[in-house]
Every structure is written in structure tokens, then in C-alpha cells.
């Protein structure tokens, strides 16, 4: 998103599953919005979701939890890394390969939690109009969902 250069223009762009939270500072977030605006036709729409502090804290109330599914289990660990102002999430996936055999995969990623005020500032600074802002709790936990319109 930070470096995307698309020659085509689109009527709408969708960015879900809190992908914007992976942008680790304000400059990256603003640059991504500018790139998305360039890829939209005039009056085009940008739909995205993003986590806020309350939402990520509700996802990790104990900072560790296990998720047991039919063919895999996941152990999630969460911590807030104050010195870098990012949330660190570690996930250990145990994928069933045979009847009693599992293969382990580990992943660590960082998420930046942006305030609603900062999101609104980026929207304004990059030439979008806020059409709606709602909470969606139906897919993969609670997320703020924004619908923007490109204005010129």
C-alpha cells in the first residue's frame, strides 16, 4: 500500500482484515491513503476496516489465548511494546498433517493502533470524504469500518 503504483483507476477499493494496522506510522498510513486515492476514479469509494485500542484489547483480554479448530490449533500471544508504540502478536499454528501428527508454524507481527481522531485527520488530509463509520462484529471480531469517497 505504501509503494503501490497502479496505472488503472477503479470505482472502488476494499482493504479488509485490519490491513491498515500493519502500517507502522502516520507517514506510511498517509502515503497509503494518497496512493489509494490516485488509484480511484473521481467520486470513487474506499472501504476499509481497522482496529482501535478497545477492539484489540477485547480480542486479547488475557494477552494469551488458544483457538482449537478441526484441523489446526493456534496459540495467540499479545503484548503492547511501549518503546515502539506497537502491538506485538505472536501466533503458533499447529496444522494437522496426519492422524496424530501436527506441524508447527510460528509467526510474529506488529500492529499500529491509530486513534479515531488520527484516522479522521488522514481522511481530511488526503482528499476523502467520510460517508460512514460503523462497527462490524460479524467477521473475525470487532472492527471499525469506514466508507470514504474520493473528492477533488
Ranges and model annotations:
Residues 1-3, 53-54, 137-138:
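Conserved beta-strand edge residues that scaffold enzyme active sites
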Residues 2-13:
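A short acidic, Gly/Pro-enriched loop at the edge of an enzyme's catalytic core
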Residues 9, 42, 127-129:
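Short loop/turn motifs at secondary-structure junctions
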Residues 10, 85-87, 141-144:
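A short, glycine/Asx- and small/polar-enriched loop/turn
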Residues 11-28:
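A short SAM/SAH-binding and catalytic strip from SAM-dependent methyltransferases
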Residues 47-118:
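SAM-dependent methyltransferase
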